[in-house]
């Protein structure tokens, strides 16, 4: 990523027949706004590849949102061949933290986890 942090706002259309989401320019039936913020928390270069580790906060939760918003800007996720990555392997997308208000106790519950020590995660953790 060129910027250390930022906010991405796009209009997305999900084609259910292809199971693929596209960034579009105009509002029409089925198009939804997608918003996320990101912060680069790590950067590595290996074998000529420049990789960034990002902390992402979704303001909306659209199908393939993270994948398509970054790919549309030329930054496909590692291993995400559907959205333009030339690298084979598992998609490098991991939910490190999730929190929510428990409906029974009405208290905030938080879970943290690091990814397994496999490529590309082993470069950062």
Predicted regions and their residues:
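RNA pseudouridine synthases
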Residues: 1-125
């Amino acid at each position: 990523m060129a910027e250390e942090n930022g906010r991405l706002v796009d209009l997305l259309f999900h084609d259910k027949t292809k199971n693929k989401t596209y960034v579009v320019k105009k509002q029409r039936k089925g198009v939804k706004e997608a918003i996320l913020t990101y912060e680069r928390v790590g950067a590595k270069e290996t074998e000529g590849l420049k990789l960034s580790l990002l902390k992402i906060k979704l303001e909306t939760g659209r199908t393939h949102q993270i994948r398509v918003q970054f790919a549309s800007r030329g930054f496909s996720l590692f291993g995400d061949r559907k959205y333009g990555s030339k690298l084979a392997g598992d998609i490098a997308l991991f939910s490190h933290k999730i929190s929510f208000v428990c409906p029974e106790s009405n208290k905030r519950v938080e879970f943290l986890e690091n990814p397994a020590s496999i490529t590309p995660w082993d470069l950062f953790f």
